[in-house]
């Protein structure tokens, strides 16, 4: 007995034994007890991640509302410009006769102290259109961080608004549009439009947003391409499939009938940036809000138990939300929908790109396309589909920011090669936009900005 006891004491003093014991305990806790993101389990993703095609959302949009009192549109603002933008967007919704009574802007609580004149004007306009301004503390990972995205975590307050059953959120640097069938860029204005149909997607989906199609590792060649060949259906075949799907949904009312991703690594190879979050449909939950706060302000024990979810210095709202969704999907604790990006997730910068097939295809077919391809691209056709457009053209300034035609960022703009060349050289004496024969895309890009100036007329105080 004494010999065994002394052997055990000697073993405890052995550093190699201590290291091995620590590794064993760490593995047990992290991989068995806590199920961290280091374990990738592909089984079951198809049951929890669903594609919401345009035709399906159109079908849901035609269904009657049950009770809109518990629904809300939301935006957030951390400065006066974005508060003003949010108010303009909600004025648009009111003029579009949205059925949703609650239009709520979450704003940084210090805004009504800094510039009283601006605040007073903005508050009066918001009150006139029955827009609720709700103060909330700024959320930042570090108050030493002064980057453009440092305060973007503030948008996560929307998850804590549990007085509502469903929220449709969009960033305030977006614009709602309804494009006329007859295109005349010189004399055309958008009609007023809402996106009430998003409140009607299946209740089983507690989160939905478009795919960040512009950040796909497979298309960029950073992740292996699928081994199997998948034929992307032409318009006619795809239309027939959608008609059958809508018919089946009308009969069975089962969200499991919705399409899934064809290639599961399409998600797993892009898990940190798969979902865009400039527009979201969410089910508020205090648990979700508290969990997101942990993803921003990591508990000390995550360094041991949840290393895959630790926030990196350049992780902001989009990256953090994707980490959270990745964990929830792998643990099969959430049902998520992929909204059609060509309707709700459009970036203005798309019309300045050289290649467009990644925008053209349905989300499930993205891994099977070529990066440098314009197959299926018809700018006017896609222009007419858009309901929400997000001003995103970095490094080109936003339309409410000051521009200078002599700055380097002008090389990121586009100019019709059939346009006025004398004006081209006069307007851009140093850094010149890229000349393109896609003149419709040039007209569309310019029209978005001109439409914004019309939208803000009479309501711009910032």
From Swiss-Prot:
Q: Which residues lie on this side of the membrane: Lumenal?
A: 36-462
User: Which Gene Ontology cellular component terms are annotated?
Assistant: Golgi membrane; vacuolar membrane
Motif segment (DXD): 171-173
Cytoplasmic compartment residues: 1-18
Q: Which domain of life is it from?
A: Eukaryota
Q: What is its EC number?
A: 2.4.1.-
Compartment list:
Golgi apparatus membrane; Vacuole membrane
Q: How does it sit in the membrane?
A: Single-pass type II membrane protein
What are the record keywords, sorted?
Golgi apparatus, Membrane, Signal-anchor, Transferase, Transmembrane, Transmembrane helix, Vacuole
From the UniProt record, which GO molecular function terms apply? glycosyltransferase activity
Q: Which residues cross the membrane?
A: 19-35
**Gene3D superfamilies in UniProt:** Spore Coat Polysaccharide Biosynthesis Protein SpsA, Chain A
For the keyword Iron, the answer is: no
What positions belong to coiled-coil segments? none
Against InterPro entries, the record matches this protein to:
GNT1/Glycosyltrans_8, Nucleotide-diphossugar_trans
* Role of this protein: N-acetylglucosaminyltransferase involved in the Golgi-specific modification of N-linked glycans.
Hey, which family's this protein in?
A: Belongs to the GNT1 family.
What is the name of the protein in this document? Answer: Glucose N-acetyltransferase 1
Q: What is the lineage of its organism?
A: Eukaryota, Fungi, Dikarya, Ascomycota, Saccharomycotina
């Amino acid at each position: 007995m004494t010999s065994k006891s002394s052997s055990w004491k000697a073993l405890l003093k052995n550093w190699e034994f201590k290291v091995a014991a620590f590794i064993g305990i760490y593995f047990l806790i992290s991989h068995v007890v806590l199920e961290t993101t280091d374990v990738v389990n592909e089984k079951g993703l198809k049951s929890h991640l669903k594609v919401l095609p345009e035709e399906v959302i159109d079908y849901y949009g035609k269904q009657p509302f049950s009770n809109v009192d518990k629904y809300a549109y939301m935006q957030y603002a951390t400065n006066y410009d974005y508060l003003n933008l949010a108010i303009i967007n909600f004025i648009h919704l009111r003029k579009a006769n949205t059925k949703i009574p609650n239009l709520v802007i979450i704003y940084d609580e210090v805004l009504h102290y800094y510039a009283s004149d601006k605040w007073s004007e903005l508050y009066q306009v918001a009150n006139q259109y029955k827009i609720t301004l709700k103060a909330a503390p700024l959320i930042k990972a570090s108050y030493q961080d002064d980057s453009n995205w440092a305060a973007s975590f503030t948008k996560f307050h929307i998850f804590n608004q549990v007085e509502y059953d469903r929220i449709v959120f969009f960033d305030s640097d977006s614009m709602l549009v309804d494009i006329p069938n007859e295109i005349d860029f010189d004399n055309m204005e958008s009609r007023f439009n809402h996106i009430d149909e998003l409140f009607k997607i299946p209740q089983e989906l507690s989160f939905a947003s478009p795919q960040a199609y512009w950040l796909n590792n497979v298309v960029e060649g950073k992740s292996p391409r699928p081994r199997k060949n998948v034929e992307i259906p032409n318009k006619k075949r795809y239309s027939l499939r959608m008609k059958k799907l809508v018919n089946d949904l009308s009969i069975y009312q089962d969200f499991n009938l919705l399409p899934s991703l064809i290639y599961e690594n399409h998600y797993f190879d892009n898990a940190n940036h798969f979902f865009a979050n400039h527009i979201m449909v969410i089910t508020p939950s205090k648990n979700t809000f508290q969990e997101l706060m942990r993803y921003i302000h990591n508990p000390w024990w995550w360094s041991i138990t949840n290393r895959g979810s630790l926030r990196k210095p350049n992780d902001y709202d989009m990256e953090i939300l994707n980490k959270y969704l990745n964990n929830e999907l792998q643990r099969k604790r959430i049902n998520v929908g992929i909204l059609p990006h060509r309707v709700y997730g459009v970036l203005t910068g798309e019309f300045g790109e050289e290649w467009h097939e990644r925008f053209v295809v349905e989300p499930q077919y993205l891994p099977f396309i070529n990066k440098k391809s314009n197959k299926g691209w018809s700018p006017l056709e896609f222009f007419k589909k858009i309901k929400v457009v997000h001003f995103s053209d970095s490094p080109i300034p936003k339309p409410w920011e000051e521009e200078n035609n002599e700055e380097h960022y002008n090389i990121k703009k586009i100019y019709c090669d059939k346009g006025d060349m004398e004006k081209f050289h006069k307007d851009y004496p140093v850094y010149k936009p890229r000349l393109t024969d896609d003149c419709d895309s040039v007209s569309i890009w310019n029209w978005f900005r001109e439409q914004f100036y019309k939208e803000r007329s009479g309501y711009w105080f910032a």
